[in-house]
Regions:
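Residues that form generic nucleotide/phosphate-binding pockets
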Residues: 134, 161, 301, 397, ...
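Short acidic (Asp/Glu) and glycine-rich catalytic loops that position anionic groups and cofactors
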Residues: 170, 274-280, 396-402, 426-434
Length: 460
């Protein structure tokens, strides 16, 4: 009997038997091959592997997984979370933990954090060039002759020398140079604690290597002041000015791209078309070391075109404060009263037509709009003088930094300077992303102060 497809019962059984035999052979042949390999391995002593992947499985085994991080690699917001794979007491692999919780559902999370510098940190830890034992100089200074000594001898000699020096010359005669490696973690805390107990000074590692941001320090009182990196997601204009975060801020750089996907415009101001420039909407070239001229020109355009935020300037900056035209110093209470304070300053109230003390309790102006321009006569203890707001002097100084003049210094096209100024002045939430570049320049403090001025004029 044949089916509708023309296949008889005998044909069906013959075909089915052949298929089942093929399936059986397909399982028997690999088993036989594996058995042959096992027999050969037993004879030769070679390891047994079912396939190439077993080689890696055998290699990547570990006793435990510890937690760790790496200090100072990125300067800002470092300390990425890493899983440390330990075998026989040695670190042999590091992997990003990538377990940061999302703190705000409207903002991208921090994951994964970490970069190739952290992934190879253990290589540095076990590098052959790393000093692992105390060495004592046995030749003349600079001769390069050393001998290995025990930890006991090293600590004893250091302690004796410290005690003798303090007794003879005082604690101020001992200076600790802890270096960047000692700025964080247990080693750094131990050194600082020792210095405090002994009353001995230690050098600032940031100043040693030019990471101390002197412009920010003298203008704002500290060198680190910023929101977390994910706050970039709220920016509509990001200026990468003084850094290359795609290379040097790898764990946080993804927030720049995510903000850009959201609609933010990214501008990189740099001498070279670097990795961060590639991922920017605009690259603004600038000659090395001329950023102050570029920044002042941006400020000049903002003031000339009325893009500066006058309400912000009046309340949040010292630009309304009165300055003496004769000494270029702030007008102080001590100028007006016998025994007056040196830290009480004044602004001019154009409605009341008189000077007023700047409150030391609040920034709120309570409806008063201090004058930003003009000259005013003030009676002091030494006679009448002329004063003006800081902003008036600033505006006069900025007149020398038109884009046409600044381009000769900075190399940035005048049209691009105006374009940048208008973007910054009209931005709703502009951010300048900077790093530790300008601290290493002569007059780098001026470059940092100018960037702060740009943001202040823009009300940012």
């Amino acid at each position: 009997m044949k089916t509708q497809q023309g296949l008889s019962r005998r044909d069906f059984l013959r075909t089915g038997s052949a298929s089942m035999l093929g399936l059986a052979l397909s399982r028997l042949v690999p088993f036989a091959a594996r058995q042959a390999r096992a027999d050969a391995a037993e004879i030769s002593g070679a390891p047994q592997y079912d396939d190439w992947a077993d080689v890696y499985r055998e290699r990547w085994t570990w006793d435990r997984i510890a937690k760790g991080t790496h200090h100072v690699n990125c300067w800002y917001q470092r300390g990425c979370n890493w899983n440390i794979f330990v075998k026989e007491g040695l670190v042999f692999r590091e992997e990003q933990a990538a377990d940061y919780p999302q703190t705000n559902p409207d903002v991208p999370d921090y994951n994964p954090r970490g970069c190739q510098k952290g992934a190879c940190f253990s290589h540095r830890m076990y590098d052959a060039g790393r000093l692992q034992h105390p060495l004592k100089r046995v030749g003349k200074r600079g001769e390069g002759k050393w001998k290995r000594i025990s930890w006991e001898q090293a600590l004893e000699e250091l302690a004796d020398a410290t005690i003798d020096t303090i007794r003879e010359y005082g604690p101020g005669s001992i200076v600790w140079d802890i270096g960047t490696a000692g700025t964080n973690g247990c080693s750094g805390l131990g050194i600082v604690r020792t210095c405090n107990v002994l009353d001995t000074p230690f050098l600032n590692a940031n100043a040693d290597i030019g990471d101390h941001h002197p412009g920010a320090a003298v203008t704002l009182g500290k060198i680190c002041f910023a929101s977390s990196a994910d706050d970039l997601f709220y920016s509509d204009l990001i200026l990468i000015w003084g850094g290359n975060p795609v290379y040097t801020q790898i764990p946080n750089a993804h927030f720049i791209n995510e903000a850009r996907y959201k609609g933010a415009e990214v501008v990189t101001i740099a001498p070279d078309y670097n990795a961060s420039s590639i991922h920017a909407d605009i690259w603004a070239p600038v000659n090395v070391g001329s950023d102050a001229a570029l920044g002042l020109s941006i400020c000049q355009v903002m003031v000339e075109e009325g893009l500066h935020d006058q309400a912000f300037i009046r309340e949040q900056t010292d630009l309304p404060l009165l300055v003496r035209r004769d000494t270029r110093l702030f007008l102080r209470q001590s100028d007006l009263e016998e025994g007056g304070s040196d830290d009480v300053f004044y602004f001019f109230d154009p409605v009341a037509r008189e000077i007023r003390e700047v409150s030391q309790a609040t920034l709120a102006l309570e409806g008063i709009e201090p004058a930003l321009e003009g000259e005013f006569a003030v009676a002091t203890r030494d006679g009448e003088i002329i004063v003006e707001p800081v902003f008036a002097g600033l505006k006069r100084q900025l007149a020398d930094y038109t884009p046409e003049r600044a381009t000769k210094i900075s190399g940035t096209p005048a049209s691009l300077i105006r374009r940048l100024a208008r973007k910054i002045g009209r931005a709703g939430a502009a951010t300048i992303l900077t790093q530790s570049n300008f601290s290493k320049f002569y007059h780098g403090n001026k470059m940092e102060r100018v960037k702060i001025l740009v943001l202040a004029l823009a009300g940012q």
